[in-house]
Amino acid sequence: MVDIVMATFNGGKYLRVQLDSILNQTYKNIRIIIRDDGSIDDTVEIIREYREKYPEKIVLISDNVQCGSSKSNFMQAMKSATAEYVMCSDQDDYWLPDKIQHSIDRMLEIEQKIGKDKPVLVFGTYQPVDENLKGIKVQKKNRQESAYKLVFTNLLVQNYVNGCLMLMNRSLADAMGDYNDAILMHDWWAVLIASGAGTVEHIDEVMMLYRQHCNNVVGAVNVKSFRYRLKKILDSDTKNANILYFNQAKLLYERNRDLLMPEHQIELERFIKLYDKKKIGRMIDLIRGGYLKSDFVRIVGQLYYI
């Protein structure tokens, strides 16, 4: 079985379309676990409508916990996911019919090679669309998900995987643990664990339509444009990003170091110790260790604010 975890908040406008796309998957052995974080629109009403229609497929979590963020909402919802495999779903996308089946097929191939006890994460590709599900032309090289540098040292400072594309096995789901403020995003946290202790694999296939609208948390942006690059360097978040990466890395070490492969334990320890050095030493060790982002402009900002 596959548990599909959906974290909702004021998503009524697109929710029915997304739920229908999941229920119409070719892979049928699923359960949709939905946790709402205090919506004031018709989101909960829609969920209850679908739960009544598909009682064996839809679970609505009612725990009276106010999370206040997408990452916390997802991780709170994941506590109820007990199936052998777990996926995450946004409330406003559209899954193509074979998304689950093709993800499961690849997962089983990997588990047959390395075993089910290792954390495994597989993820596909999305097609950006507008709010009416009409295609948006975004050159592949300009997408935020373009590079897929699935190297542990790179992943410590930049995530390349959207949660809505992921399938994780039970070993990975169990290793994620409870929410902590040091976790930057639930998908990034999952990728770090899988990369350090097991494996992460990209499936080069469009599996879903990623709806672009004003309320998206993350989008398919042109990371090569001058405007985007300049904004990233000047953005106040960039100044604070390095310490956030270190805090997340420290949490990974505290919680999961015994799971990590020996070489990744060493890489993680070296990364954490960077902050004990002066700026020039940190810059040198970032470069030597390969703890770098995906392109020149991002790296400049990273080194400038380290």
What are these regions (language model features)?
Residues 1-222:
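Nucleotide-sugar donor-binding/catalytic module of glycosyltransferases
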Residues 183, 189, 211-306:
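C-terminal subregions of glycosyltransferases and related glycan-biosynthesis enzymes
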